[in-house]
């Protein structure tokens, strides 16, 4: 089964840094010597918990150029620093940081366990496209998707599943993003559209053999079909 995934970060992820032109027409790097690096997560500014990019922008603008205390996570260690926002010609205050607070995509559901209503998907974690760091999530949505195309994998080139997650139904919630996959709970089983009467036993590691592999997929909400 193919499903859509929307992840919301715990704090905001720093995905880049750039110089800022201030009102004085000079170039500034307010992030310099703060210890903040790409891949870090900003979780608090002064006494405000940061949960989105918009909240960070608003909080920085409220500083009016005064020094602010930033709490961030660097390689699983919580750190703090002082940083002074730079006023731009448009009267905005900026830190010179590019940040992101969410990610989305489609992927295969690995399993659904009826007795606990839990699911696993992807078989690998979701990393940020810019930093390649595993995204530390605060919450997530598990939603239906419309599959548009499946590209078979070839030697040296992995296969791809393309789909859209716009205007789709909620299936459940995502609680964990790990290097082994995405995990969560199914709240709306009818939206997942699976036949729970046909359970399949998961093979043990020592039972797996090299050979042809197939996926079961529903294209355009039709009955599941098998694809090599």
Please report, for each region that a protein language model flagged, where it lies by residue.
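Short, Lys/Arg- and Gly-enriched loop/turn segments at beta-strand edges
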Residues: 48-59, 80, 224-226
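PDZ-domain C-terminal substructure recognizer with occasional recognition of PDZ-binding tails
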Residues: 3, 37, 57-96
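Serine endopeptidase catalytic core focused on the charge-relay Asp
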Residues: 86-228
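PDZ/PDZ-like groove recognition
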Residues: 4-37
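Conserved PDZ fold ligand-binding element
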Residues: 31-54
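N-terminal targeting leaders that route proteins to membranes or the secretory/organellar pathways
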Residues: 1-13, 54, 65-67
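Terminal peptide-recognition signature
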Residues: 14, 31, 39-42, 70, ...
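Short, surface-exposed secondary-structure boundary micro-motifs
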Residues: 47-48, 73, 218
């Amino acid at each position: 089964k193919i499903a859509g995934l929307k992840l919301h970060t715990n704090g905001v992820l720093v995905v880049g840094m750039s110089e800022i032109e201030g009102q004085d027409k000079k170039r500034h790097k307010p992030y310099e010597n703060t210890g903040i690096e790409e891949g870090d997560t900003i979780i608090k500014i002064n006494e405000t918990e940061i949960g989105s990019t918009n909240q960070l922008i608003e909080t920085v603008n409220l500083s009016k150029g005064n020094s602010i205390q930033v709490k961030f996570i660097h390689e699983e260690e919580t750190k703090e620093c002082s940083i002074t926002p730079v006023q731009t010609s448009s009267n905005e205050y900026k830190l010179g940081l590019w940040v992101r607070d969410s990610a989305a995509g489609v992927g295969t559901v690995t399993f659904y366990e009826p007795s606990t209503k839990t699911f696993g998907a992807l078989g690998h974690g979701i990393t940020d496209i810019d930093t390649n760091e595993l995204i530390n999530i605060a919450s997530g949505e598990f939603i239906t998707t419309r599959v548009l195309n499946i590209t078979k994998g070839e030697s040296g080139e992995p296969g791809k599943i393309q789909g859209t997650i716009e205007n789709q139904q909620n299936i459940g919630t995502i609680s964990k993003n790990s290097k082994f996959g995405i995990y969560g709970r199914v709240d709306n089983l009818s939206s997942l559209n699976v036949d729970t009467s046909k359970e399949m036993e998961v093979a043990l590691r020592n039972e797996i053999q090299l050979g042809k592999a197939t996926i079961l997929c529903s294209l355009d909400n039709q009955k599941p079909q098998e694809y090599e």
